[in-house]
Swiss-Prot record:
C2H2-type zinc finger span: 55-82, 83-110, 111-138, 139-166, 167-194
Gene3D superfamilies from the UniProt entry: Classic Zinc Finger
Keyword Kinase appears in the UniProt entry: no
Annotated segments matching region Disordered: 1-33, 188-218
Name of the protein: Zinc finger protein 22
Segments crossing the lipid bilayer: none
GO cellular component entries: nucleoplasm; nucleus
Keyword tags: Acetylation, DNA-binding, Metal-binding, Nucleus, Repeat, Transcription, Transcription regulation, Zinc, Zinc-finger
Function description: Binds DNA through the consensus sequence 5'-CAATG-3'. May be involved in transcriptional regulation and may play a role in tooth formation.
Gene of this entry: Znf22
Keyword flag Cell cycle: no
Native source species: Rattus norvegicus
PANTHER family (UniProt xref): ZINC FINGER AND SCAN DOMAIN-CONTAINING (PTHR23226), ZINC FINGER PROTEIN 22 (PTHR23226:SF402)
Biased amino acid composition, Basic residues: 188-217
Entry's Gene Ontology BP terms: odontogenesis; regulation of DNA-templated transcription; regulation of transcription by RNA polymerase II
Amino acid sequence: MRLGKPKGGISRSASQGKTYESKRKTARQRQKWGVAIRFDSGLSRRRRNVDEKPYKCTKCSKSFSQSSTLFQHKKIHTGKKSHKCADCGKSFFQSSNLIQHRRIHTGEKPYKCDECGERFKQSSNLIQHQRIHTGEKPYCCDECGRCFSQSSHLIQHQRTHTGEKPYQCEECDKCFSQSSHLRQHMKVHKEKKSHKRGKNARAKTHPVSWKRGKGRKAVAGLRQVKGAASGLFKKKK
C-alpha cells in the first residue's frame, strides 16, 4: 500500500524544519537589539542548569538566562514603571513587585509555615522564618567565623570589624552602625524639641504667669547670690 503525499505537496518534516528555521532567524534578529526570544523551552531549561546567560543588556552589560528577565531588567534603564497600584498610586517595574505590594492593602499572607502555621506575605520571609525551626545559618563572617540566619544580620555584624557607620543623624551628625541605633538616638532630639515646644506654648497661652514664674526664679537666684555675698562679708569681719 502506497502512502499518498500530504495536501500542498510538502511533507510534515519539511514544514517543521521551515518553522524551526524561521524561529531561529527571528531569534537572531531579536538578539541583534539585545533581546532574544525563547524558541526552545528545553534549551532554556538546560541553560539554567549550566548557568549560561546568553541575553546581555546593552546598557550595563548584565547577563540573563531568559529573554523575559532581560526585558524586565531593561525597564530599569528606561525608568518606565508600567504596573501601578490602584489603591495608593505607587508604580513598579515588574508585575510581581506590584502583586507583593498589593498584599499590604489586602493583608493577604499566602505563604504558610508547616511547622508553626505562621503566615507571610512574601516567600523570602517564609524562608528566613523557617531557619528558626531548622537552625540553619548559611551566612558566615570571613573574619571570625560567626554565622547568621539572615544576610542583613551578617552585614550588621561585619561593621563591628570594619568600623563602618553608614547611618548619620541629620541633627548632630553623629553616626551609627545600625539603623535601629539611629532611630533610638533620634528620640533624644524629638524629646528635646517637644519639651521646647511645650515651653513656647505655655509662654503664648499664659504669658503673665509664665513671666511671673520666670521672674520668681530670677528673684530667687538674686537672693541666693546676695545671701552668699553677705556670708562672705561677715566672715571677713
